[in-house]
């Protein structure tokens, strides 16, 4: 996990794949099971132009630019704007650690395979560098020129050393000598002291000192400690802030250290000092050997991660040319990987400012409602009794996760009639009540199976800890299938009811994480349907045993079923559209997801558009599809909704064939070829009506969003002067607890 919040947690990272001409190409030594052949297309791709795809890396940068647009929006609560500045920064860190690192590896290996839009790895790196410099500079300016002055108007100041009076400097001198100086280690560079290792994402001061005797100059590096606050608060605040709020004055800790460099280098003259920060390659893959303990292999690779090669160097834009040249040489960084920042580096630290107790400067508190099916009554029913009466669709965070999905697992753990609980865990919270319930169930003698995905990027250490805690409690812990990540969100409860064994299920789009469930928009299906129960039984058997199950009754399961299943449904939609006549306009596909990249799925949508099927895509992040282009995508629109909550659900609707699907898979190579993913059909008309309503709200012409044009540019919509509604606010008002 990077930063204090994974608001944009799934930033579409993963191994950089060769996209053309073989979208299923694998690297030498890759033991990932081969993906099945694609469904037979209704028409050949010869009818589609070569330039039909947008670049996925540049599309991701456009997504992060939309996050930045939220920070620049002065109609947003002020501390929420600071939060989005922090999110932008941590997003970009992760993008460089994984996506850019993967492209660099391919370039260095001489792999010349083109991306789907026809660019070599080197060409993509060049464009990424140019675009990153633009948006990183804008990011710094939004903070410096807009958010920072606005914070000052509210009595929240981020000051410089020059702004301080003598009393404040004396106060900070005491703090420095007591709290900071003991943990600083100045590292000189000379023939006896090689250039020190600089850890990834650490903030550092590059210092030049001069010897008074002979004028000789030397370089030294001082690491800014990460165990002290980035922003040091000055004491003695008053209440002269807006509406009587306390005044807060903060000094960046690197400024404090810089002010006391003479203490670190006594007897030396400080010539210059500049902040810098490097990002290292974190794009490693665990070599999975059937004869080796996966936990040990992963821990070995995690230890190596911190020593990855540098992929980005961030410097203050006033760094001297000589200092920059020294850093480039010693850190072995290409000049094209330098990002010059006009202001403070590493604004992910703004989470500290966001944490101030200033509710008037934040979004209004929202308390999720309990789903009506699970509402407390005079004689409360168990969730099992409720599900026997019919399926329930929960929409988080508008409906509470803790009183629905979490309670489902907790009731199962406490119910003496429950025989077994089986669940997948991809990312979970540090004090997870779900994991606690599984441990309680195992200690009570139930059969508990947890499929823990310990390879979930940047959450590996946390998942290893939970895996060991579960094992110690007697839970049967499995790590899935060699070569695949288990990303599906599924839970199965087996319960004895008299002479009958009944299975209860949950299939969702989001993680079993009670904290992110308050921040991420997701949907989940709770059901006692026998066919889904049988399907999940087969799925868990394949994950824990040697089953080679490839087909299911009511599920689509990757890596062998989702791509082909979706393309088949697109083609059935085309057939139904043509059967009723294009004039009837019956063909209509609506898709909501985090990312749309897979070329085979995109081509199927293009072919559907060419015969008149209307296609509406709501995509939060990457979109490689080019909508609205003459000749192949005139009938396709794509929009992106960003806001208070991370839009995370994956929902598919094929109107002519009357099918709704939800699940964990985005339309990306990694999800469809290298992960275990599950999509489930929602059949109950009561629930499909809820999904239809969700689409209607998201696709309302008045909904605030960004719309994608055929040129790859995202434009804010509706245009100024038009009526605007906020999709998420509308849903909050509808679900707000009394």
Swiss-Prot record:
Pfam families: PP_kinase, PP_kinase_C, PP_kinase_C_1, PP_kinase_N. One of its GO terms (molecular function) is ATP binding. GO terms for biological process: polyphosphate biosynthetic process. Belongs to the polyphosphate kinase 1 (PPK1) family. Catalyzes the reversible transfer of the terminal phosphate of ATP to form a long-chain polyphosphate (polyP). Keywords: ATP-binding, Kinase, Magnesium, Metal-binding, Nucleotide-binding, Phosphoprotein, Transferase. It catalyses: [phosphate](n) + ATP = [phosphate](n+1) + ADP. Its EC number is 2.7.4.1. ATP binds at residues 91, 520, 620, 648. This is Polyphosphate kinase. InterPro entries: PP_kinase (IPR003414), PP_kinase_C_1 (IPR041108), PP_kinase_middle (IPR024953), PP_kinase_middle_dom_sf (IPR036830), PPK_C_dom2 (IPR025200), PPK_N_dom (IPR025198), PPK_N_dom_sf (IPR036832). An intermediate of this reaction is the autophosphorylated ppk in which a phosphate is covalently linked to a histidine residue through a N-P bond.
């Amino acid at each position: 996990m990077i930063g204090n919040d994974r608001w944009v947690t799934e930033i579409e990272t993963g191994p950089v794949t060769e996209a053309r001409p073989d979208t299923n190409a694998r690297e030498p030594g890759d033991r990932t099971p081969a993906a099945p052949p694609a469904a037979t297309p209704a028409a050949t791709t010869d009818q589609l132009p070569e330039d039909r795809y947008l670049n996925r890396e540049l599309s991701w940068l456009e997504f992060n630019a939309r996050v930045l647009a939220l920070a620049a929006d002065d109609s947003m609560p002020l501390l929420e704007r600071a939060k989005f500045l922090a999110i932008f920064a941590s997003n970009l860190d992760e993008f460089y650690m994984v996506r850019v690192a993967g492209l660099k590896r391919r370039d260095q290996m001489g792999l010349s395979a083109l991306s789907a839009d026809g660019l070599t790895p080197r060409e993509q790196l060049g464009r990424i560098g140019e675009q990153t410099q633009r948006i990183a500079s804008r990011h710094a300016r939004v903070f410096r020129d807009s958010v920072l002055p606005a914070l000052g108007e509210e009595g929240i100041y981020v000051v410089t050393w020059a702004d301080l009076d003598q009393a404040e400097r004396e106060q900070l001198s005491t703090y420095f000598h007591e709290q900071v100086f003991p943990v600083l280690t100045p590292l000189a560079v000379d023939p006896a002291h090689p250039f020190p290792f600089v850890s990834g994402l650490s903030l550092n001061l590059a210092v030049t000192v001069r010897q008074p005797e002979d004028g000789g100059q030397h370089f030294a590096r001082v690491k800014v400690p990460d165990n002290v606050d980035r922003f040091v608060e000055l004491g003695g605040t008053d209440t002269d802030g807006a509406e009587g709020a306390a005044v807060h004055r903060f000094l960046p800790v690197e400024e404090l250290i810089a002010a006391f460099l003479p203490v670190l280098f006594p007897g030396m003259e400080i010539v210059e000092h500049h902040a810098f920060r490097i990002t290292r390659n974190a794009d490693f893959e665990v070599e999975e050997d059937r004869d080796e303990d996966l936990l040990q292999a992963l821990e070995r690779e995690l230890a190596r991660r911190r020593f990855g090669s540098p992929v980005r160097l961030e410097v203050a834009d006033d760094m001297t040319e000589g200092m920059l040249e020294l850093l480039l040489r010693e850190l072995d960084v290409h000049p094209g990987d330098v990002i010059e920042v006009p202001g403070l580096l590493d604004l992910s630290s703004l989470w500290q400012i966001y944490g101030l107790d200033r509710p008037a400067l934040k979004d209004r508190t929202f308390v999720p409602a309990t789903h009506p099916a699970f509402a407390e009554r005079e004689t409360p029913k168990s969730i099992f009794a409720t599900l026997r009466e019919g399926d329930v669709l929960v929409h988080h965070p508008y409906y509470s996760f803790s009183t629905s999905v979490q309670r489902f697992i907790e009731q199962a753990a406490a119910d003496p009639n429950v025989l077994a609980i089986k669940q997948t865990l991809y990312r979970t919270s540090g004090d997870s009540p779900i994991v606690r319930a599984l441990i309680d169930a195992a200690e009570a003698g139930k059969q508990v199976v947890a499929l823990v995905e310990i390879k979930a990027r940047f959450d590996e250490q946390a998942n290893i800890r939970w895996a060991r805690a579960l094992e110690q409690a007697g839970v049967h812990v499995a790590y899935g299938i060699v070569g695949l990540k288990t990303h599906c969100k599924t839970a199965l409860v087996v319960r004895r009811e008299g002479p009958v064994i009944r299975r209860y299920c949950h299939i969702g789009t989001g993680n079993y994480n009670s904290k992110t469930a308050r921040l991420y928009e997701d949907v989940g299906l709770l059901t006692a349907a026998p066919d889904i129960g049988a399907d999940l039984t087969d799925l868990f058997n394949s994950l824990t045993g040697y089953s080679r199950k490839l087909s299911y009754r009511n599920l689509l399961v990757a890596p062998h079923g989702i791509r082909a299943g979706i393309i088949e449904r697109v083609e059935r939609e085309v057939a139904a559209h043509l059967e009723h006549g294009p004039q009837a306009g019956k063909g209509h596909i609506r898709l909501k997801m985090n990312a749309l990249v897979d070329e085979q799925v995109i081509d199927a949508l293009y072919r559907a558009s060419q015969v008149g099927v209307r296609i509406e895509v709501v995509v939060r992040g990457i979109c490689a599809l080019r909508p609205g282009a003459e000749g192949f995508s005139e009938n396709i629109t794509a929009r992106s909704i960003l806001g208070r909550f991370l839009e995370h659900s994956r929902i598919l609707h094929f109107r002519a064939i009357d099918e709704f699907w939800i699940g964990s898979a985005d339309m990306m190579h990694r999800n469809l070829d290298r992960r275990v993913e599950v999509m489930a059909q929602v059949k109950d008309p009561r629930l499909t009506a809820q999904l239809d309503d969700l689409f209607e709200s998201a696709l309302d012409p008045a909904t605030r969003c960004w719309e994608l044009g055929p040129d790859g540019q995202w434009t804010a919509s509706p245009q100024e002067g038009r009526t605007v509604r906020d999709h998420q606010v509308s849903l909050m008002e509808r679900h707000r607890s009394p």
